[in-house]
């Protein structure tokens, strides 16, 4: 997380310092963040972990796909390097292993709740990326 925050600060400094400061998150960033916060504070640990997994997994997949295509002077290369790197891949693999272990050692009902949380977080992740791509903002 520390490396990610440093990377984001560096990217903003290099490429967005001339843009007006955005004081609030986009609609789906706001909703997704609140969903994850709610899961982390109210759900069983197994369900909370399941809700976090799609974010890491998607970033890993996007990083690996982007890392496979080398583009000279890519302004996103540091981002690609972070999310396609060995350290991040190990973190994701560890998270997935933990998620699988939690699922194997819990009740059927909790497994169903884990699946629902994973599916909802995956939907949120997709809408987060779509919203960024379409530059969605609050309509009112």
Model-derived features with residue positions:
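Short, flexible helix-adjacent loops and helix caps
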Residues: 41, 68, 103-107, 133, ...
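Acidic, carboxylate-rich catalytic segments that either coordinate divalent cations
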Residues: 113-140
